[in-house]
Amino acid sequence: MTAQKMTAQEIIAFIGNAVKKTTVKVTFEGELAGAVPAEVTKLGNVLFGDWKDVEPLLANLTENVDYVVEQDGRNSAVPLLDKRNINARIEPGAIIRDQVTIGDNAVIMMGAVINIGAEIGPGTMIDMGAILGGRATVGKNSHIGAGAVLAGVIEPASAEPVRVGDNVLVGANAVVIEGVQIGSGSVVAAGAIVTQDVPENVVVAGVPARIIKEIDAQTQQKTALEEALRTL
């Protein structure tokens, strides 16, 4: 699925101009005294909508008055991504905001957090608990390890986002600082903190990360992707 590519200023405007909503699901007993407005969806004894539209209905319940409110945000500006038509494997518990691009056969594991404006290429895996900040970009057939962070940039608007190339492996709990670019074919070792651009086809490790060697056949074998994990 390809979302419209947004600049930092466009994302800021999108958030600033968005109608802020506190979306709720309310299960109630009793009868609603008033008409249900168009902004609220009623299915049996369940209401879905913004709290400001739902609350007045609950105030006018008659007979066996009781209800339970479920919510997961307050004055939210950015909805979660509608994942129904995405040609990728997205596991339960991944948090993906709207205006994110996810390529075919990508894999998003449970606990991953992907912010507005991020781009994930075809065949790329975002592992458990990894974080892609706003506008972070990952190319095709890459792997972002569990707990890794690609720092996001929405403000200041002038800053550059993280860009990761194709066929890159970022190890578990590594951190890539704002504006850094990781060249295609490179490997970032687990726990590394990357503060400078990384050229293509090298291995970096350490705090701060430094080049420790060029990619060789042994490294390629150890970091090879498993296509079966990307089969839908």
Curated annotation (Swiss-Prot):
Q: What EC number(s) does its UniProt record assign?
A: 2.3.1.89
Pathway-wise, it operates in: Amino-acid biosynthesis; L-lysine biosynthesis via DAP pathway; LL-2,6-diaminopimelate from (S)-tetrahydrodipicolinate (acetylase route): step 1/3
**Which GO molecular-function terms appear in the entry?**
tetrahydrodipicolinate N-acetyltransferase activity
Q: Which reaction does it catalyse?
A: (S)-2,3,4,5-tetrahydrodipicolinate + acetyl-CoA + H2O = L-2-acetamido-6-oxoheptanedioate + CoA
Question: Which keywords accompany this UniProt record?
Answer: Acyltransferase, Amino-acid biosynthesis, Diaminopimelate biosynthesis, Lysine biosynthesis, Repeat, Transferase
Q: Does the keyword Amino-acid biosynthesis apply?
A: yes
The lineage's top-level taxon is: Bacteria
Mind telling me which InterPro entries this protein's record contains? DapH (IPR019873), DapH_N (IPR013710), Hexapep (IPR001451), Hexapep_transf_CS (IPR018357), Trans_hexapeptide_repeat (IPR050179), Trimer_LpxA-like_sf (IPR011004)
* Gene Ontology BP term (one): lysine biosynthetic process via diaminopimelate
Q: Which PROSITE patterns match?
A: HEXAPEP_TRANSFERASES
Q: Which family does it belong to?
A: Belongs to the transferase hexapeptide repeat family. DapH subfamily.
Function, please?
Catalyzes the transfer of an acetyl group from acetyl-CoA to tetrahydrodipicolinate.
Q: What is this protein called?
A: 2,3,4,5-tetrahydropyridine-2,6-dicarboxylate N-acetyltransferase
Species for this entry? Streptococcus suis (strain 05ZYH33)
Name of the gene this protein is made from: dapH
